[in-house]
């Protein structure tokens, strides 16, 4: 089972890659850093604050196994939400305004959920 040992919200001094959306965390940007232990292995998990927040808002953690939410599942869940809510039947695709990288998508979904 996954255990969170520590969670901090530092400001990036160097570029990182978000474990959820696979996009860059830029220097100067605040992000989430978790120190976790799973199956006896201690590791750090870094993600955008917005990605962590949208994962909670969309209840992505509810169907996780003992290892927690991974990036592939996060991106798949985010794609499913956008497809379900922003599908354009005329183009047989999501609306062009939603055809963005997963970090931008997470920010757009959060904004949308906060306006509901």
Residue ranges: model-predicted function:
Residues 18-21, 48:
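Short cysteine-rich clusters marking metal-coordination/redox-active sites
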């Amino acid at each position: 089972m996954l255990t969170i040992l520590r969670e901090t919200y530092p400001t990036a001094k160097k570029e990182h890659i978000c474990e959820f959306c696979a996009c860059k965390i830029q220097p100067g940007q605040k992000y989430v850093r978790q120190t976790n232990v799973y199956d006896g292995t201690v590791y750090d998990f870094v993600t955008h604050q917005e990605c962590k927040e949208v994962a909670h808002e969309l209840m992505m953690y509810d169907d996780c196994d003992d290892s927690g939410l991974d990036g592939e599942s996060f991106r798949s869940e985010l794609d499913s939400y956008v497809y379900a809510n922003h599908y354009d039947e005329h183009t047989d695709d999501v609306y062009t305004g939603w055809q963005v990288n997963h970090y931008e998508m997470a920010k757009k979904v959060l904004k949308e959920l906060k306006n509901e």
